[in-house]
């Protein structure tokens, strides 16, 4: 399946289709968009975003704790869309405080 992903970036919203077996960060780059990242392995906070709607599978990541996951934090480098999803990007500073 493929889902509509909407990313709310500081430069405005971007939208693209993302298969459910492709990480959102990878698909965003494939679509020509530059997003922040560092490790690409779900073990840092560079690519962190916040889910504004929809659902993702990010079980490949290990940086976020259960509370952060419940609050809607997402690491786009290890997130597969599970529905149409809207994510606010560039949120690392807010996450790590």
Swiss-Prot record:
Q: Name one GO biological process term.
A: ferredoxin metabolic process
> Is Iron there in the keyword field?
yes
Per its record, how is this protein called by name? Ferredoxin
Give the source species: Capsicum annuum var. annuum (Red pepper)
2Fe-2S ferredoxin-type domain residues: 3-93
Matches recorded under Pfam families:
Fer2 (PF00111)
User: Where does this protein hold [2Fe-2S] cluster?
Assistant: 39, 44, 47, 77
Keyword tags:
2Fe-2S, Chloroplast, Electron transport, Iron, Iron-sulfur, Metal-binding, Plastid, Transport
């Amino acid at each position: 399946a493929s889902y509509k992903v909407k990313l709310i970036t500081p430069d405005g919203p971007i939208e693209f289709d993302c298969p459910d077996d492709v990480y959102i960060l990878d698909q965003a780059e494939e679509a020509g968009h530059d997003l922040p990242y560092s490790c690409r392995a779900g073990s840092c906070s560079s690519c962190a975003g916040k889910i504004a709607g929809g659902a993702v599978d990010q079980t490949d990541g290990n940086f976020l704790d259960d509370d952060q996951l419940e609050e809607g934090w997402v690491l786009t480098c290890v997130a597969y869309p599970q529905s149409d999803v809207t994510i606010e990007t560039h949120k690392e500073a807010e996450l790590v405080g």
